[in-house]
Amino acid sequence: LCRELDPTRPVTSALCAWDSDWEIYDPLAEAFELVGYNYMIHKHATDHERDPQRVMYQSESYPREAFWNWAYSADHPYIFGDFVWTAIDYQGESGIGRWYYQGESEGEHYHRNQYPWHAAYCGDIDFVGQRKPISYYRDMLWNVDRPLYLSVKEPNGYYGQIRETQWSVWPTFESWTWPGHEGRPIEVEIYNRAPRVRLYLNDSLVAERPTTRVEEYKAVITIPYVPGTLRA
């Protein structure tokens, strides 16, 4: 019916299955020109052996796996892209991408009601249209001309012991203001497509690190927190 109504476009579907006997979906996959994989693109190698003509893409992926989902496409011509869940935040599946603190309601969104959460909070772009640091990292992976981006990870224990869900990323911010944390270690993340990066605090060089593909185009540098100006 799809091809009858519109013969000009390829037909696809997102295969959403967690079964160990993944191969039972081969007949369904053969009906499509493009085969979408929800969270299962790691099965690409064995699938390609069984069906070398299959053209694949990841139709849903976890936000924190940005590098590997880019690498699958970069390294294999039969994988043409990745769709993260999700690009933009939305209402529903409340708290699917939340991080939380020890002592708060635990577990994934499907385990229990996560009130007062009402947004999903798994978007690279948040509910009011602001980009999270993960969005800059993903953008840089897919576009080699993007400038470096500097962000800071919330220290574990600053507000509480951090817990993550399957669709969350560690709370990371474009901020160097952490009162009360003076002298204690804090992690800085720099996303960069150049071979190396230098980190300066109050105009003093504090670290230099490689940022090649081996490092996933990212430097994670731990330094003591000192108020002032951080730049790279």
Regions picked out by a protein language model, each given a short descriptive name:
Residues 1-16, 26-33, 43-231:
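Substrate-binding clefts and catalytic carboxylate motifs of secreted carbohydrate-active enzymes
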Residues 36-40:
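A general structural motif
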